[in-house]
Regions:
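Membrane-embedded transmembrane alpha-helical bundles that form the catalytic cores
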Residues: 2-446, 452-497
Length: 498
């Protein structure tokens, strides 16, 4: 028998926050806790009030394990925007509504600005006025702050625009903002799509939802633990840490490797988030749709991080005027939107470069389509051979444009970003050798891009024929096998830092 002290020692880590070990979907601890949580959740199908607060409690616990005391910030934002949303709906004056939505935007952006950009502006001030002008601040960045603040902003803005009615209960709004599957890295869920699902009675999980959820959790775990983490630890990290040690071909392979790593990491998280939500009876929007199939930058942003792309379009690009104010203004709006999208990821010159280049890419594609309309107003129908050659060339150009810009996203500083690009385009430098064991992981990742939809359909079809209990056992066995296949230890998801 364990002594009381031994039991306490085993339980304490579950109740304490460790900044070096945030709770991750891909950890054995989370999967075990979720299984226990889901078991009791099943008994609350017909009790909405109890179910809502049960989920809120687990969500806040999950966030506490990720960001500690900053769960109070999450709760504070929910209180603030809940009451501002209700005030916007009930005041009669449009001027008062405008002031209230401005207050919400200013408060949320001030919170985001403090945590993400304080040291960025201090660095600028030190460059202008000298190193002794200001000291850098040791500011902890709460996990997922950009995601839940964007969700909260969309809520008050939609009420102001008249496209959404405010919720009557604060608990419902806290549920929406804190729901653990999407809390720390999206998808960015719109209030109008999610709030109507909260008080389902009874909560409905169809066989199709259950099978799809299990597939998405399994494939997301595989993408993260087996492909992304393996490529990162065994190849990509080594080259990006010190590119001067590697040849141009090895640096090019690392560029391709990181393009695959970030896709498998982020889409793997999104798959798991959507799958977990489905098992609980909630539907999230798709967040990735084979983005590396894209033949233009515009198409890429319709397929990559779809919830963020749609948010930037609806609340920033359209608010700036969209394409309604002339060609030059359209290009300007695209550039501003992508620059701010880049800075949303982080306060660093690398993200600024990344955003500027994507904005330029979108503007160039838009200008190309305008020219095509001018020269071929009735349309242009090339021969099949010419069509496929053009599509292939466009895909190749788009893929490399996106992949090389990921270098700025991944490298620790501009110096290493430029060193990798220099070595890629100046061949002949000696290197340490390409690790052949990485190749299978790369090939599997590419296969998921090409055949993911077919695999999904086949898996769900097979799963739906099995009893629910068998499906749960399959998930547990496959999940355990995947975790054993992956590297030792669990690496944080890349988008946790945003």
């Amino acid at each position: 028998m364990e002594s009381l002290r031994e039991i306490i020692d085993r339980v304490l880590p579950l109740l304490s926050y460790d900044p070096q070990a945030p709770m991750l979907f891909s950890s054995e601890l989370f999967l075990f806790l979720f299984a226990a949580f889901a078991f009791f959740y099943g008994f609350m199908r017909r009790t909405p009030a109890l179910r809502i607060w049960y989920v809120i409690a687990f969500s806040l616990y999950f966030y506490y394990k990720s960001s500690g005391i900053y769960l109070l910030l999450l709760v504070g934002v929910s209180v603030s925007d809940f009451w501002i949303g209700r005030a916007i709906a009930h005041v009669g004056s449009r001027r008062a509504q405008r002031a209230l939505v401005a207050l919400s935007i200013a408060a949320d952006l001030a919170v985001l600005g403090y945590f993400k950009y304080t040291n960025f502006f201090i660095e600028i001030a030190r460059d202008l006025f000298g190193a002794g002008f200001l000291e850098f601040q040791n500011i902890f960045l709460p996990v997922g702050i950009s995601f839940f603040l964007f969700q909260s902003l969309s809520y008050t803005i939609d009420i102001y625009r008249g496209s959404l009615k405010p919720v009557d209960r604060w608990g419902d709004y806290l549920f929406y903002l804190s729901f653990f599957p999407q809390l720390v890295a999206g998808p960015i869920v719109r209030a109008r799509d999610f709030l109507v699902q909260i008080r389902q009675n009874p909560i409905a999980v169809s066989r199709e939802m259950f099978g799809t959820g299990i597939y998405l959790i399994t494939i997301g775990l595989f993408k993260k633990a087996v492909i992304s983490d393996y490529i990162s630890l065994n190849f990509v990290d080594r080259i990006f840490d010190d590119p001067a040690l590697y040849s141009g071909m090895e640096c090019l392979a690392a560029v391709y490797g990181y393009a695959l790593q970030i896709y498998c990491d982020f889409s793997g998280y999104s798959d798991m988030a959507i799958g977990l939500a489905l098992l609980l009876g909630f539907r999230f929007p798709k967040n990735f749709d084979a983005p590396y199939h894209s033949a233009t930058i515009t198409e890429f942003w319709r397929r990559w991080h779809i919830s963020l792309s749609m948010w930037l379009r609806d609340y920033l690009y359209i608010s700036l005027g969209g394409n309604r104010k002339g060609r030059l203004r359209t290009y300007f709006n695209l550039l501003v939107t992508m620059v701010l999208g880049g800075l949303w990821h982080g306060s660093n010159i690398r993200f600024l470069v990344w955003g500027v280049m994507h904005g330029v890419g979108l503007a160039v594609v838009h200008a190309f389509h305008e020219l095509k309309k001018r020269f071929w107003p009735d349309g242009f129908t090339p021969s099949p051979a010419l069509h496929w050659c053009g599509v292939g060339a466009a895909w190749l150009l788009t893929f490399h444009f996106v992949s090389f810009l990921w270098v700025f996203f991944r490298a620790e500083d501009m110096e290493r970003s430029l060193e990798i690009l220099r070595r890629v385009f100046v061949f002949g430098q000696p290197g340490e050798g390409f690790p052949l064991l990485v190749i299978p992981a790369v090939l599997i990742g590419l296969a998921l891009q090409l055949f993911g939809a077919r695999l999904f359909a086949a898996f769900v079809d097979a799963q739906e024929r099995l009893p629910w209990a068998v499906q749960a056992v399959v998930l547990a066995l496959v999940g355990g096998f995947i975790l054993k296949m992956g590297p030792d230890g669990v690496m944080p998801f890349i988008y946790f830092q945003f």
